[in-house]
Amino acid sequence: VSGQQGKQALPEIEPTASGDALYKVLGNAARGLYMLIARVEIAGRENLPKSGGYIIVANHTTELDPVTVAFPAFVEGALPRFLAKDSLFRAPVLGYIMRKLAHIPVVRGSVDARKSLITARKIVEAGGAVIIFPEGTTTHDPQLWPMQAR
């Protein structure tokens, strides 16, 4: 299946037991490191469902946002899947991790972009968590907020 401007679409990514185990190892390592370098207080934790799927939508202002936004869900036992631009899945190390952890690639501006929403919906319907940064990129200038979804 081809994506935007002839780019080869990424294969559909499905969670696996080994990927989930790696997610837990990396998540716990990130959690420990995060607790060492930052004083973390999770406000609104009670709003995360104890059962059933859900979507977290957040602004994307720093490169630490994925860890920061996923942190409460991870602490509550979820392995949230991110919708992320497909180029991240093509990076040598990060791409391997993104694919292994079953995050969801978005091929912007193509018919394949719809597939990412279908995948996200399946995850939520199966009781999982999905994280979306609607801007699709980071922005450091509050004057540009609210950004338009891409």
What are these regions (language model features)?
Residues V1-L10:
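Soluble, non-transmembrane catalytic domains of enzymes that act on hydrophobic metabolites at membranes
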Residues L10-A30:
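N-terminal targeting/anchor module and adjacent flexible "hinge" preceding the catalytic domain
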Residues G19, G27, L36-R150:
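Soluble catalytic domains of membrane acyltransferases
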